[in-house]
């Protein structure tokens, strides 16, 4: 359990170097922080600040092409948390991180924000994304990464998932897989009752 004074969400958990690591979203801190599990999943210790001076959401790491890649949506000024995708690359997941030369690599409220770990499928990379065109949590998408290198980034959304009749909530947030299972999390938008 990790408790801090700032907002925490989207715990990106991964294994590397024989350890379990986590990068939680904590955009209010202005940093992207790395934690190491001391007693998974209950105990965590702060290991490093990966990036400082950035208001970023849903940082997601991927090892690809001999490098580590960090995907995150960056909020600049009064903009959205969901529409501007930035990339960084590094020789190791601890850094040092170099911003992609074409940041932001994508401006699209329908597919910039991450919705879970990137997975290898059918010889390609699939990136779960949040489709916020109709509001936060309106839908998820599955984007195939077409190009990822130091010169360019490209993706194509191939599938969209919306909350259906069997979904108890009204919003979708994250798609993840572990142990042969796939998980989708979301929330229910509370109805506002007008008093009169």
Protein language model regions, located:
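Carbohydrate-active catalytic/glycan-binding domains of CAZyme proteins
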Residues: 1-196
